[in-house]
From Swiss-Prot:
Belongs to the universal ribosomal protein uL24 family. Keywords: Ribonucleoprotein, Ribosomal protein, RNA-binding, rRNA-binding. GO terms for biological process: translation. This is Large ribosomal subunit protein uL24. GO terms for molecular function: rRNA binding; structural constituent of ribosome. PANTHER family: MITOCHONDRIAL RIBOSOMAL PROTEIN L24. One of two assembly initiator proteins, it binds directly to the 5'-end of the 23S rRNA, where it nucleates assembly of the 50S subunit. One of the proteins that surrounds the polypeptide exit tunnel on the outside of the subunit. HAMAP family: Ribosomal_uL24_B (MF_01326_B). The keyword Transmembrane does not apply. Gene3D superfamilies: 2.30.30.30. One of its GO terms (cellular component) is ribonucleoprotein complex. It comes from the Bacteria. InterPro entries: Rib_uL2_dom2 (IPR014722), Ribosomal_uL24 (IPR003256), Ribosomal_uL24_KOW (IPR041988), Translation_prot_SH3-like_sf (IPR008991).
């Protein structure tokens, strides 16, 4: 199945402790999970690594969340939405299923 969401898409979390939070996709993993900015934070107990000049301690990092637990956020309706594909002028374009409006391309930065 093709991933309909992409990096830097504005999304909303559907389930879990961060339900309802709006954020962006930071990274998409190959196992069907995504890493979101500032969501699903876990604390990792890190040992110091003097060879790499890395201090030890408790580090907060973003853990992956399954992509079925997130949905793209439609700013026109203010709700989560589904995505479809259609061809416009010979190019494949993503669009919101509720409104039919094309999703603007986001530059990677």
């Amino acid at each position: 199945m093709a991933m309909k969401i992409r990096c830097n898409d504005q999304i909303i979390v559907l389930t879990g402790k961060d339900k309802g939070k709006r954020t962006k996709i930071k990274k998409i993993l190959k196992n069907g999970k995504v890493i979101l900015e500032g969501v699903n934070l876990v604390k990792k107990h890190q040992k110091p690594v003097p060879a790499q000049n890395q201090p030890g301690g408790i580090i907060e990092k973003e853990a992956p969340i399954d992509f079925s637990n997130v949905a793209i956020f439609n700013e026109d309706t203010g709700k989560a939405d589904r995505i479809g594909f259609k061809y416009e002028n010979g190019k494949k374009v993503r669009f919101f299923k509720s409104s039919g409006k094309a999703i603007a391309k986001i530059n990677k930065s």
